């Protein structure tokens, strides 16, 4: 897409939001409580603040304000307001390609916010526990938050990821014509690295005329030992391993597809 010569400030709002899910099997009530306590401490408000603050530092954003809160019995949230450092719009790369990895990120945000909320969850029957983190990066100006996508997913790799990207509003060029998007995009996957795409099965649901893009990601490899909390697969019978594997895989598919699946 040819670079636009705008009249005044770029008034487009670009919002990137995604949910990450971590799934675990905890055999007993004590193990379930232990997992919830572990994941709640791992992603408490202070830890989330460190992650988001480091994100701001990497992308070159100025932190204006931080609001954070831990909740009882579990969960946390952090919201950071940031502003952009001076940047020449002509120097901004608007091409579609995977965002850089953490060690190479250099970018700017403008009058923007980054927020995260966590939702640990378990049920007394079945042994399944889930952890969900909602993250949103919203910007106004020439910068797309998609540039931060690759870094954030690398930081928060999980079993399932759902991503939404939307461009709202319009901006005008020097001739007064309105533009409702200022960069080319046909899939969020264009902004992911090849190694990231190789780890997940992905599907897109896009509404191009509304500038709405959606991608769902499900981890390809399944190894039971990575889903057990304080229990080793080798300590279980073959029947138990098969039953737990089936329960975990069903849980992951239900979250991925967003609907309950009947047992076969």
UniProtKB/Swiss-Prot annotation:
Presence of the UniProt keyword Translocase in the record: no
Changes after translation: Is synthesized initially as an inactive proenzyme. Formation of the active enzyme involves a self-maturation process in which the active site pyruvoyl group is generated from an internal serine residue via an autocatalytic post-translational modification. Two non-identical subunits are generated from the proenzyme in this reaction, and the pyruvate is formed at the N-terminus of the alpha chain, which is derived from the carboxyl end of the proenzyme.
Signal peptide feature range: none
Biochemical pathway: Amine and polyamine biosynthesis; S-adenosylmethioninamine biosynthesis; S-adenosylmethioninamine from S-adenosyl-L-methionine: step 1/1
Record flagged with keyword Lyase: yes
Coiled-coil ranges (or none): none
Cofactor(s) this protein requires: pyruvate
Disulfide bonds: none
Lineage top rank: taxon: Bacteria
Entry EC number(s): 4.1.1.50
Active site: 112 (schiff-base intermediate with substrate), 117 (proton acceptor), 140 (proton donor)
Any one cellular-component term (Gene Ontology): cytosol
Biological role stated in the UniProt entry: Catalyzes the decarboxylation of S-adenosylmethionine to S-adenosylmethioninamine (dcAdoMet), the propylamine donor required for the synthesis of the polyamines spermine and spermidine from the diamine putrescine.
Protein name: S-adenosylmethionine decarboxylase proenzyme
Gene source species: Salmonella choleraesuis (strain SC-B67)
């Amino acid at each position: 897409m040819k670079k636009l010569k705008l009249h005044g400030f770029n008034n487009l709002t670009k919002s990137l939001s995604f949910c990450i899910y971590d799934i675990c099997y905890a055999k007993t009530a004590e193990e379930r409580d232990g997992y919830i306590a572990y994941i709640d401490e791992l992603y408490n408000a202070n830890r989330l603040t460190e992650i988001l603050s480091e994100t701001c530092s990497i992308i070159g954003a100025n932190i204006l304000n931080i609001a954070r809160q831990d909740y009882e019995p579990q969960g946390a949230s952090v919201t950071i307001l940031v502003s952009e450092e001076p940047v020449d719009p002509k120097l901004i790369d608007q091409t579609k390609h995977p965002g850089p990895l953490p060690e190479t990120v250099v970018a700017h945000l403008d009058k923007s916010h980054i927020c995260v909320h966590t939702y640990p969850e378990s049920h007394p029957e079945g042994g399944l526990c889930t952890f969900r983190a909602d993250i949103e990066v919203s910007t106004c100006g020439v910068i797309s938050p998609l540039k931060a996508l690759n870094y954030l997913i690398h930081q928060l790799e999980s079993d399932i990821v759902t991503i939404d990207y939307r461009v709202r509003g319009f901006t005008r060029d020097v001739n007064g014509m309105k533009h409702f998007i200022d960069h080319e995009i046909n899939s969020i996957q264009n902004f992911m690295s090849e190694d990231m795409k190789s780890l997940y099965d992905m599907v897109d649901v896009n509404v191009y005329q509304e500038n709405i893009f959606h991608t769902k990601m499900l981890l390809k490899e399944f190894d039971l030992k990575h889903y057990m909390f304080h229990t080793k697969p080798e300590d279980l019978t073959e029947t138990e391993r098969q039953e737990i594997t089936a329960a975990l895989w069903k849980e992951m598919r239900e979250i991925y597809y967003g609907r309950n699946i009947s047992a076969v």
